[in-house]
Amino acid sequence: MADVYLDNNATTRVDDEIVEAMLPFFTEQFGNPSSLHSFGNQVGLALKRARQQRAGVLGEHDSEIIFTSCGTESDHAILSALSPARAQDLITTVVEHPAVLSLCDYLASEGYTVHKLPVDKKGRLDLDHYASLLNDDVAVVSVMWANNETGTLFPVEEMARMADEAGIMFHTDAVQAVRKLPIDLKNSSIHMLSLSGHKLHRKGVGVLYLRRGTRFRRCCRGHQERPAGGTENAASIIAMGWAAERALAFMEHENTEVKRLRDKLEAGILAVVPHAFVTGDPDNRLPNTANIAFEYIEGEAILLLLNKVGIAASSGSACTSGSLEPSHVMRAMDIPYTAAHGTVRFSLSRYTTEEEIDRVIREVPPIVAQLRNVSPYWSGNGPVEHPGKAFAPVYG
């Protein structure tokens, strides 16, 4: 029986057509696109088309597209908004991807002031609180478009408009949003936007959208890839162009069929498994993402048993990296620790089938029951009221 892959918010399988599009640029068309000879010209024209393909998905001009090595490098473009001669404050959220949070923590250690917007129990932001922080001391706002754990969507268009009106640069990490949601930047107030190929059924390349007129300070010197330094990774960039077109072609499928399968997965599990619930904003989230909290057990244990039966998912907990704390996203949402430890993220793609979802719905309930039978929080058919000190809460 084939394995079931439901960890597409971590990375995606490479589209077969995209592999075919890449191959010639490893063998026949291998020139440096900056060269004047025909080998370089061939690749240069292909890169121009890839830039246009990528721009077409986002609705912006191809001159505003910069290719990078990954989404994290694109996220670090927020450094370009900072200067000792200008404002020193940053605004982000407590639930950002580590690519942004770790950078903000580093900047805080260097003397910058970082304001982290809190979220409510559904992972939503308070725009009134956000508005109160917009002032002349703020240099840049960086807010993800969609949360990678819960799929909760943030109102980045409105937040960008508010920042722009205050004269503040706005960046969004759209890595999780781009293949699943229509994005049109033509009339947007967003100054910078980050993407990653490996969430688009492509590997090894990132994209930075930089609105024309936005100041940008290079982190890596060189001239080849516009404001970013370094010779272009031609095969990966060209594949990214194809990935962009394929994402646009499958957009409706993501928002109808993938969402239907996601909803079926959630309903099927919750109908059978008691003391479980979906985290995040139920009305405003990605169509492919289901983050389910299974109370009174450990998410990592669920993942290990799922893996034994050929199902790949991921946990909201950081335990696999040596920490016993739930993820920063679950803690920020104030999910009870008996539930936050048991979160599992199922993230679907256009390759997910009905049969796979049916299989997951069959396999999850007995795994949860097996783990609860050995949990100090569980006895018989329900939770223990006073489990003692077997597991102490790791946060308030």
UniProtKB/Swiss-Prot annotation:
Residues bound to [2Fe-2S] cluster: C319
GO biological-process terms attached to the record: amino acid metabolic process; nitrogen fixation
The EC number(s) this enzyme carries: 2.8.1.7
GO MF: cysteine desulfurase activity; iron-sulfur cluster binding; metal ion binding; pyridoxal phosphate binding
Highest taxon in the source lineage: Bacteria
Keyword annotations: Iron, Iron-sulfur, Metal-binding, Nitrogen fixation, Pyridoxal phosphate, Transferase
Assembly: Homodimer.
Similarity comment: family membership: Belongs to the class-V pyridoxal-phosphate-dependent aminotransferase family. NifS/IscS subfamily.
Function according to Swiss-Prot or TrEMBL: Catalyzes the removal of elemental sulfur atoms from cysteine to produce alanine. Seems to participate in the biosynthesis of the nitrogenase metalloclusters by providing the inorganic sulfur required for the Fe-S core formation.
Protein name (database record): Cysteine desulfurase
Organism expressing this protein natively: Azotobacter chroococcum mcd 1
Source taxonomy: Bacteria, Pseudomonadati, Pseudomonadota, Gammaproteobacteria, Pseudomonadales
